[in-house]
Amino acid sequence: MEFTVQQIAEVLGGTVEGDATARISHLAKIEEAQAGALSFLANIKYEPYLYTTGATVVIVSQDFAPRQPVAAALIRVADPYLSFSKLLEFYQRTTRTGKRGVEQPCYQADSAQVGGGGYRGAFSYIGEDCVIGQNVLIFPQAYIGDRCRIGDGTIVYAGARLYPDTVVGQRCVIHAGAVLGADGFGFAPQPDGSYQPIPQIGNVVLEDNVSIGANATIDCATLGSTIIREGSKIDNLVQLAHNVEVGRHTVIASQTGIAGSAKIGDYCVLAGQVGMAGHVSLANKTTVTAQSGVGKTVKQEGLILQGSTAFDFKQNQRAQIVFRRLPELEERLRAVEAAVSAPEKP
């Protein structure tokens, strides 16, 4: 599939400098691009590549001023990175997710309702009383349990598992191996030291435009719902326990674990390997740095938390400075103690 530079510029709302009729067939990094490629320049440290790239066209910011001659055509836009990401999304939609129709063998219960325009891969399973929207792509070996609801335009990649009663909004992406709706980790200790399983009869709800990474696991609620709200993005290998609530447009990076009934606000950022205790809350716009532990509720919005247990970023930085100086401070303290305890000379 090919497009002209002018066609790309019109899609992005940009202006062209150079040959607007040149044809584009693929996307590439600016340092590796060859003829027929489209690339972008968002980080100024990559500017030297602009003067040597083989790309046919490069997306740049509106106010960028080249310091040397540029062979490639330029498309000027307000935000090069955002514009390039839109093109990547379009490319993915027309290549990876362009599948349509039904592959055999696959299973669909007679009571299931499946909208048109979608795709069902071989060995996929759709259970009783499911309602699947328009243009939903269900890749091979995906499992959609009984009574699930999936909104229009959602993608369920190969091997993903949606337990019964899971609700997924529109335009969501559930990557390979993700499991939504498995039992929460609920066990009641018994007098003899054993544990009695507590039935988990709730479900999982994803609102619109949520992304779930590969092999992420989101447990169903004990009662009610485990909820991921609109626009939030969950990375690979994240564990969300029963009754967790994640706010709107929050991002959670890989290997993070959130214990039961924790509540995360809107526009939060949890970096990799964060741990969060159960029944605590994070205020909106909280950032938790990598490998930090959150053990208590944070009520103030906009804080950056660091450390285990996590506390205010600036306080933690000061504490780290003192920590690194502990050997020196210990020596000084011993010297002071020795001087104080030494007998006075007559």
State where each predicted segment sits.
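Terminal amphipathic alpha-helical/low-complexity segments used for targeting or macromolecular assembly
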Residues: 1-105, 171, 177-178, 183-196, ...
